[in-house]
Each structure stands twice: as structure tokens, then as C-alpha cells.
Design a protein with these regions (language model features):
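Active-site environment of divalent metal-dependent phosphoester hydrolases
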Residues: 46-48, 79-84, 103-114, 167-170, ...
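Bacterial N-terminal signal peptides
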Residues: 8-17
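N-terminal active-site segment of His-dependent metallophosphoesterases
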Residues: 22-93
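His/acidic metal-ligating clusters that form di-metal
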Residues: 67-69, 158-160, 173-262
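Acidic/histidine-rich helix-loop elements
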Residues: 38-56, 77-85, 111, 117, ...
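Active-site-proximal beta-strand elements of phosphoester/diester hydrolases
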Residues: 34-47, 156-166, 208
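Extended active-site neighborhood of metal-dependent phosphoesterases/phosphodiesterases
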Residues: 88-200
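Divalent metal-coordination and catalytic microenvironments
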Residues: 42, 59, 71, 76, ...
Length: 263
């Protein structure tokens, strides 16, 4: 992903009817069934860079105006050394407000002086952090954020966060990595479990990851597609399609996906 100097075009505001995290880190609907998620992506923080400071100003402006209940960063927070400083600065607008937040890594985050696991460990105890991991599958930042009903008695919606990895490890395949089959199996199994516990009806769900799947480019090429916003480049998707979009369609729960990586 090319270096992005500002946050223009990388912000999504999602209004999906929920409320802030409690002291026990439980997300749930509130009485008026409103909740706001702000998505930040590709902050590309470089310590000492004026463009990074400008990005912080834009994030602060958004948070002050929107007053979100949850913030999700979809990758490429870190773009310079030391990674710990870059990551802290990229998260500071949220952490300073003690807002609930969740993170997934992009292809650039672990290119400096910390691994994905080290980055995850670094933010573990930050106030409001909901980022987690699932052992035994590819990637690091794969986890589920269930959203409870307003009375807290049942699951009412689900947020799926995927680690889309970084670059292809296959010599014959160039470019970016993809969400692996074991990650898709994890999603399907999780989705089936939530559906079964909901009496056979899929729970409304959203998915967040960094590198878009190939269907993003296919959708943009559809002459009947309604594209909102500014599209400065193609989706920079992986060359291999592992079927995540198809799995989501079959599960019937994902209402929308939110990614980063492109302008």
C-alpha cells in the first residue's frame, strides 16, 4: 500500500444501533438502539512526520464531532520506527478519551521493529482496548466482538475482525496476502454457532479487515454499481481468492465489510 499523507478517504462512520463498552468490556444495545462506530484506517504513523501530526488532528476532529461508541482501526497504523511510538501516537486520540477500540493489522504494521504479536502485546493493557486473538489459525488479529441486547441477556449482533496478513508467501504468486482457509473456517464455525443459538436465524453482523478481497474490484467494474466517495486506485486485492465473500453470502449474516489498504 502506498504511503498516504492524510486521512482523506479512509474514514467510515457506521451507525448500527448499539452502546459503549461497559467496565467489563461488554458491548450492548442501549435503550434507543443507537450506536456509532468510527473506522480509522491507514494512519501510516511516522514519528516526527508532520503529515502524521495532521492525521492526528483529523482523528481528533472526527472523534469530537461524532462522539463514537467504538473505534475500529483496520490496519497500517505503523509506518516508521520506533513502532511502539508510532502505534501509541496513532491510538492516542482514542486512548486519551478512554473510548472502546479494536485493531487489526495491515501489511505495513510489522515492517519496522516489532512483530504482529509484539504489537498486540504492547496495546494489551491500554484503556478501552478490545483487540484479541484466536489461537490455532493464520494471522494474529482474528477475533469476534459480540454485541448484547439492551438488557444484556442475549447476543444481538456480531462484529468479526480478520487479520488479512501481509504479502504472498508463494513464489509463483506476487502481491498481497489473503485471508486463509483456516480463518474462513473459523468464521463459518463462529457464525454457525451464533445462528444456532439464535434459533436458526443469522445475527446481523459486520466484518473488518485490512486487505480487501477480490470482489471489491469486481463490484467496482460493474456498470450498474453505485460507488459513493472517491476512488483513486483499484482495491489492491490479492491474486488468490479463497472464498471469504462466498462464505459470508452462504452464512447470511454479514451485512457489510469494511477494509483499508486503498485510497
Amino acid at each position: 500500500m502506498k504511503k498516504i499523507k492524510t486521512l482523506c478517504g479512509v474514514l467510515a462512520l457506521l451507525c448500527v444501533g448499539m452502546m459503549p463498552v461497559s467496565a467489563q468490556n461488554v458491548l450492548k444495545f442501549n435503550a434507543d438502539k443507537k450506536f456509532k462506530i468510527v473506522q480509522f484506517t491507514d494512519v501510516h504513523w511516522v514519528p516526527g512526520d508532520s503529515a502524521s501530526e495532521e492525521a492526528a488532528e483529523r482523528m481528533n476532529e472526527v472523534l469530537d464531532v461524532e462522539k463514537p461508541d467504538l473505534v475500529i482501526y483496520t490496519g497500517d497504523l505503523v509506518f516508521g520506527k520506533p513502532a511502539s511510538e508510532a502505534l501509541s501516537k496513532a491510538l492516542e486520540p482514542v486512548v486519551s478519551r478512554r473510548l472502546p477500540f479494536a485493531v487489526t493489522w495491515g501489511n505495513h504494521d510489522d515492517e519496522q521493529d516489532m512483530t504482529r504479536i509484539e504489537l498486540l502485546e504492547y496495546i494489551k493493557d491500554m484503556p478501552g482496548n478490545l483487540t484479541s486473538t484466536t489461537a490455532g489459525i493464520s494471522g494474529v488479529t482474528n477475533y469476534v466482538l459480540p454485541l448484547k441486547s439492551e438488557d444484556g441477556k442475549k447476543d444481538a449482533a456480531v462484529l468479526y475482525v480478520f487479520d488479512s496478513n501481509a504479502y504472498s508467501s508463494l513464489k509463483q504468486v506476487k502481491g498481497y496476502d489473503w485471508i486463509r482457509p483456516d480463518q474462513i473456517n473459523w468464521y463459518v464455525e463462529s457464525s454457525v454457532g451464533y445462528t444456532e443459538r439464535n434459533g436458526g436465524k443469522p445475527l446481523p453482523s459486520l466484518a473488518f479487515f485490512h486487505i480487501p478481497f477480490p470482489e471489491y474490484n469486481e463490484a467496482a467494474q460493474d456498470e450498474n454499481a453505485l460507488l459513493i466517495g472517491t476512488r483513486k486506485e483499484k482495491a489492491c486485492a490479492p491474486l488468490i481468492n479463497t472464498g471469504l465473500y462466498a462464505a459470508m453470502l452462504n452464512a447470511g449474516d454479514i451485512m457489510a465489510t469494511f477494509v483499508g489498504h486503498t485510497m
